Swiss-Prot record:
Xref: SUPFAM superfamilies: EF-Tu/eEF-1alpha/eIF2-gamma C-terminal domain, P-loop containing nucleoside triphosphate hydrolases, Translation proteins
Keyword Nucleotide-binding applies: yes
Gene: nodQ
Name this protein carries in UniProt: Bifunctional enzyme NodQ
Region named G1: 31-38
Domain tr-type G: 22-236
Region spans: Sulfate adenylyltransferase: 1-457
Function (record text): Proposed to provide activated sulfate for transfer to Nod factor. ATP sulfurylase may be the GTPase, regulating ATP sulfurylase activity.
Amino acid sequence: MPYPFSISPHDMEEHLVQEDKGPVLRFITCGSVDDGKSTLIGRLLCDAQLVFEDQLADLRHGGIRGGNGEEIDFSLVLDGLEAEREQGITIDVAYRYFSTSKRKFIVADTPGHFEYTRNMATGASTADLAVILVDSRQGILQQTRRHSYLASLLGIRHVVLAVNKIDLIDFSEPIFDAIVAEYVRFSAKLGFASVMAIPMSARFGDNVVSKSGKLPWYQGSPLLEYLETVELDAPDRQEPFRFPVQLVMRPNADFRGYAGRIASGKIAVGDPVIVAKSGLRSSVRAIIAPDGNQISAAEGEPVTLVLADEVDVSRGDMLVDPASRPFVSDQFQAHLIWFDANPMLPGRSYLLRTETDSVSATVTVLKHQLNVDSFVREPAKLLQMNEVGVCNIMTQRPIVFDAYKENRSTGNFIIVDRVSSATVGAGMIDFPLRRADNVHWQALDVDKAARSALKNQKPAVLWLTGLSGSGKSTIANALEALLHTCGKHTYLLDGDNVRHGLNRDLGFTAVDRVENIRRVAEVAKLMADAGLIVICSFISPFRDERRMARELMGEGEFIEIFVDTPLDECARRDPKGLYKKAFAGNIANFTGVSSPYEAPENPELHLKTMGQEPARLALQIEEFLRSRMEEK
């Protein structure tokens, strides 16, 4: 007997394919809070006799405990967590699979709360169809528009508009027609291939599995029948072969295979393949599946490929069809959905992960934000939680990808915060930027080592960070004078001075502060490449940007120096009168007052300035630098 499971989507689909080689329909349910999404899926499974009797008994017990009397609370089929039951909401995406005599299904129940839109995006990323629920009493709401837009953005082509709780409006045809007309009107801009509207009552089962006698005016199919028979995209639109290598298999010296799951397309013994990044060519000599050798394999299958030639292939490479190669680039345009409570800041360094790559990346340009309610492009300097933007992204090294609209498997990515390791965004790649192909590194005969040898010194970047008024500039100035007397070649980059020229166009918002440090770090890198000892005196309040600066430099070149002066002392000194203005509310985004300062957690040098003369602190830095240089 078929029954619902709660396991990962990949494992579900593999299990279903092994049961029967027929296609699987992957769909999501989404809508506003309390529209009845979990109740609908629970009713669907129960009425289709896909829930065991002992599970039904548990549901009856849960219904009584939940205050619902003897009536079964079908939402509890999916809402398995105690916290969910107590709060009466679905907290995260719940995956289940089931099958009928006509089709097999994977369903994702996604939350309707505004702050959980990211989970809806997770559920939609692999779905073929979206069941979007609408409360017949409330009609089309903001979340209906939001979820419809995200479904379209994430590549879903087919929609069922489930007008639920039809019993609460006395099965009214005019109200149903008005809701459908409004939805069709606004969704016409979203490019869905089909929209099927079904009036239903998930609570009482009307038009869920069986056609309801209470809706004689409705001539269409009930939900389950429609899901069993809906025609999806034509199978002749075959996506090209993409095989991310997850593991190199070397059980002995005579065998070398490449294990992974086929992301898209199909492959057969004898087919030519190419390593996407290197361009090395070969052909498939053997395909090894869990049950043994086979002649061919297709999307979703875990296999080990053995190649006919000895080519350099490593974990993270991608084997592809030579006739339809993916893009390999370090710059591209993408649609980005932001998940995190902390905003996305252009210029900040994040981790970007794809099927094959994990690489440092920066949003170089936020072109605009997309209003998911009105579909209007709006100017923006950052993205807040649940917002969608179109941006240019640059990665530290080239990555392999397809356009998302052509291949969802290899056209998506996630953004990870470098500090917390939390997933903070997800994106869909539109196209590579031509500039990436037109700009190349010029080979130079004189390198950093030659320039450093000429100066008889090793380059370094001394990065002084601390609050305004902490003494950074005074110490930095004394340090440069000291190094100059020692015959060292230096340059001092000061936070105020660079804002008179290079960064004169930047303000003091979080976005501009990030860009300020990005530019300075790049300049410091060039100066270090020239063989100089670079002294940087900047508040640089954010750890992420200081980490970015460190990663730009050579190993051991970056020395973070925390100029630690208490806020009260900085405010007392107030050499430029800025604290007085900030405390009076006349300066916005002032570090330490109205904008945060993230102190270094593990600096190379921690200078506590209270009771110390700047010259003595400068000497302390010089001594540290000298000892560091002697170690190299």
